[in-house]
Amino acid sequence: MSGGKLNAEQQVRNEFNQWAAEGKGEEMEAHHISITEQTLAMMSLKPGERVLDLGCGTGWTSRMMAKAVANGDQPGQVVGLDVADEMIRRARAGSVDHDNVMFVVGSALEIPWEENHFDKVLSVESFYYYADQDRALAELFRVLAPKGELYILINLYRDNHYSLRWVEELKIPVQVRTEQEYVEMLKRHTYEDVRAVRVPDLTPTPEEYSGRWFKNAEELRDFKRIGALLLIARKPDIEVPPPAYQVY
């Protein structure tokens, strides 16, 4: 990993550790619950499936998925992965009642898992923070099982002009692409059945808005109507060979 990308990842780790300390990780559930629930419905999670929650934060989505895959002859498992160790600490503390979910500190650029393992991968509101999105997609391809499904959900993308206001305000670098650019990127990595879906935020909008990101409630309502971008893709029916050597 290059020094620049490592430095960018360290910036992300530091920022989200700070978010965790300030309780912002828990706030994400309220902000993203609507678009996430709609995405989970499209994923059609089944008992026994193995799922990766990439950029899991405090683990609220991981716990939802753990319930969905729990029952069956062989209970499924959810792995939550996040670069911020404080987020992972909070995720573990909040998941003691879930036997089939585990949380790991790690990078999307070097996913600490074996090849061809996960039936499904979900990433909620984290993919645009990855300094090398191509490498992340290659890693996801590696750890997905043959015919495994990938779901990437993001609010920050160029086609939603309201979201571009965040770029200069964020303290860490982000990647900003159009829907079509993301679709083409997935296809370059030989994912199949690539498609993009807009997921509107169905939560009620207050009549008065006093936040910092929108001029008024009407802008917030329009932002929700445009919706988040959900990228869906499938790994072909092939296995990725393990590396030729291992370092112990």
Model-found features: residue ranges?
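Conserved class I S-adenosyl-L-methionine
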Residues: 1-46, 60-64, 87-90, 94, ...
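Class I SAM-dependent methyltransferase SAM/SAH-binding core
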Residues: 52-110
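A short acidic, Gly/Pro-enriched loop at the edge of an enzyme's catalytic core
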Residues: 109-120
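A short glycine-rich, Lys/Arg-flanked "PGG" loop and its adjoining helix->strand segment in the class I
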Residues: 134-146
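Conserved beta-strand signature within the Rossmann-like core of class I S-adenosyl-L-methionine
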Residues: 148-154
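Short, glycine-/aromatic-enriched active-site segment of Class I SAM-dependent methyltransferases
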Residues: 155-173
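Short alpha-helix
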Residues: 174-190
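Core SAM-dependent methyltransferase catalytic element
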Residues: 207-248
